[in-house]
Amino acid sequence: EDKCSPSGAICSGFGPPEQCCSGACVPHPILRIFVCQ
């Protein structure tokens, strides 16, 4: 079962956008990670 990640959760910048509940995985402005918008 696929659970979407909430806003602010770390996500894969290369993964499907559906991994985030918002449908958007964006780069964090400070940390070198991607987070759900």
Swiss-Prot record:
The keyword Disulfide bond applies. Signal peptide: none annotated. Pfam families: Tryp_inh. Keywords: Disulfide bond, Knottin, Protease inhibitor, Serine protease inhibitor. The keyword Disulfide bond applies. One of its GO terms (molecular function) is serine-type endopeptidase inhibitor activity. Disulfide bonds join C4-C21, C11-C25, C20-C36. The record marks R32, I33 as: Reactive bond for trypsin. The presence of a 'disulfide through disulfide knot' structurally defines this protein as a knottin. Trypsin inhibitor. Belongs to the Mirabilis serine proteinase inhibitor family. This is Trypsin inhibitor 3.
